[in-house]
Regions:
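Ligand-binding clefts of soluble mixed alpha/beta catalytic domains
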Residues: 1-510
Length: 510
């Protein structure tokens, strides 16, 4: 028996060595951890259960039959994050550059199936060069199997992709179909075709960083949801993200102990909104005063900064936060902000995460660039997302809620359950100045008359009590009481039941 156990230990040590000391050293020299080191950091100590440790590829072309490493370039299994089960796979760049073979794909699909079976989140760590070209179409078939499972798991279990090195070619499409993409600055890249191919085909010279680095994908393409400085920070933040998420679409939001009293009143909120309606303020100050311990985990913080999206807790339970940001473009909705918020709202609705919407929106951004870029359809995405959502939704209007943007931002008309407004709220088709200049165009040359008519319009149409009189606002509240009101509303809505007509699926305006 001793000999058998010694053989097992030898085989495990061989698998754990990956591509060998030289390649591991090269990985560390780039500031990157190995596949196994990443899993150890991501999961609770001692919780990782590895599967398919000894799987090897079956390729016999191009001399591959003499080049085999146990595990075949990906480490798979399951473990826990703060005691909650998660499934994980981590591509090993030290073995065949982490490239995907038929058996490599089989290991991934096996744990994808496991995640669906136990209804637990799955986290994929990517550091690879794409398909293993020695296997040809077999590798492509493997990709297809992975992609199909990504689609089947969507909306059933949370899927998180962590890009910690190159992610090119077919490898990019699996992360693109997951719920969240995390990148590491300076060491991670995502692109369909790399700089060399771009140069050959288009004669365009571009670096890997400028083509598909973390900065590009967090600020321009919106492919990535967040980026961090190194592997350690990224994995610790993924652990934090997992803590906010339900295990699956029927598990309910996680609840953590909170020592932040839900009855807490914040006097500072009574003076948060400036007297001048054109003076900006930071909506994150309001978020910090309303949620537990001021803790907001932002999603896509560097993209479309005129709207804020992220996870927080109220009364220890996860909520999704969507908030216009007056500090950036006055909080206006544009194509990027609409897409960003729509995707976030859809995710929350998939996983029964209640949504808190904080509104200060002067309308949609005008201009040819927006219209040519499809603002109508992008704005409709957010409208569609809110209209289809069945989770508890609470809305607070702090200042402006003008035009179609008022409807879009979780108004009572599109299905929000509880709608509050601060006394500073202005709810109308447009601001007083613009409205008066249209209605009383003939008086534009008379400054005194325009000023008088503007004051009259403000008193008659911009007051939140006009909307409250019609039941569009459930209550006009003191700003200091916002946390208490919101917390009690969400507690009341826990038993919410909502029915939608049967359909195979909806047809969101993509």
């Amino acid at each position: 028996m001793r000999g058998v156990i010694e053989d097992l230990d030898r085989r495990r040590a061989e698998a754990a060595a990956g591509g060998g000391p030289r390649r591991v050293a090269a990985q560390h020299a780039k500031g990157k951890l190995t596949a196994r080191e990443r899993i150890e950091l991501l999961l609770d100590p001692g919780s990782f259960e590895e599967y398919d440790t000894f799987v090897e590829h079956r390729s016999v072309d191009f001399g591959m039959e003499t080049s085999k490493v146990p595990g075949d370039g990906v480490v798979t299994g399951w473990g826990t994050v703060n005691g909650r089960a998660v499934v994980v796979f981590s591509k090993d760049f030290t073995v065949f550059g982490g490239s995907l073979s038929e058996t490599h794909a089989g290991k991934i699909t096996k744990v994808q199936d496991l995640a669906m079976k136990i209804r637990a989140p799955i986290i994929g760590i990517f550091d690879a060069g794409g398909a293993r070209i020695q296997e040809g179409v077999a590798a492509l078939g493997g990709y297809g199997e992975v992609f199909r499972r990504n689609a089947e798991a969507s909306g059933v279990i949370p899927q998180i992709s962590v890009i910690m090195g190159p992610c090119a070619g077919g490898d990019v499409y699996s992360p693109a179909m997951t719920d969240f993409i995390v990148m590491v600055r300076d060491t991670s890249y995502m692109f369909v075709t790399g700089p060399d191919v771009v140069k050959t085909v288009t004669n365009e010279s571009v670096t890997a960083e400028d083509l598909g680095g973390a900065r590009v994908h967090t600020t321009k393409s919106s492919i990535a949801d967040m980026a961090f400085d190194d592997d350690v920070e990224a994995l610790l933040q993924v652990r934090r993200l997992v803590d906010f998420l339900p295990a699956n679409n029927t598990a309910g939001v996680p609840e953590w102990p909170s020592f932040d009293e839900v009855e807490r009143r914040e006097e500072a909120l009574d003076t948060l909104v400036p007297e001048n309606p054109n003076t900006p303020y930071d909506i994150k100050e309001l978020v910090a005063k309303v949620v537990d311990e001021g803790d907001l985990f932002e999603i896509q913080a560097a993209f479309a900064r005129n709207i804020v999206t992220g996870f927080a807790r109220i009364g220890g339970r996860t909520v999704g936060v969507v908030a216009n940001q007056p500090l950036v473009l006055a909080g206006v909705l544009d194509s990027d902000a609409s897409r960003k918020a729509a995707r976030f709202v859809r995710f929350c609705d998939c996983f029964e995460i209640p949504i808190l919407t904080l509104v200060d929106v002067p309308g949609f951004l005008p201009g040819t660039a927006q219209e040519y870029g499809g603002l109508i359809k992008h704005g409709a995405k957010l409208l569609f997302a809110y209209s289809q959502a069945t989770v508890p939704m609470v809305t607070v209007i702090t200042r402006k809620a003008f035009g179609g943007a008022y409807d879009v931002m979780a108004s009572k008309h599109v299905g929000a359950d509880v709608n509050y407004a601060w006394p500073s709220a202005q709810i109308a088709v447009m601001g007083a100045k613009g409205a008066v200049e249209i209605i009383f165009r003939s008086d534009i040359g008379d400054a005194d008359k325009i000023a008088e008519r503007t004051r009259d319009y403000e008193s008659r149409f911009l007051s939140p009590f006009v909307a409250a009189e019609r039941g569009y606002i459930d209550e006009v509240i003191r700003p200091r009481s916002t946390r208490r009101r919101v917390a009690r509303a969400f507690a009341m809505l826990r038993s919410k039941a909502a029915a939608k007509p049967w359909r195979k699926h909806d047809n969101i305006p993509l």
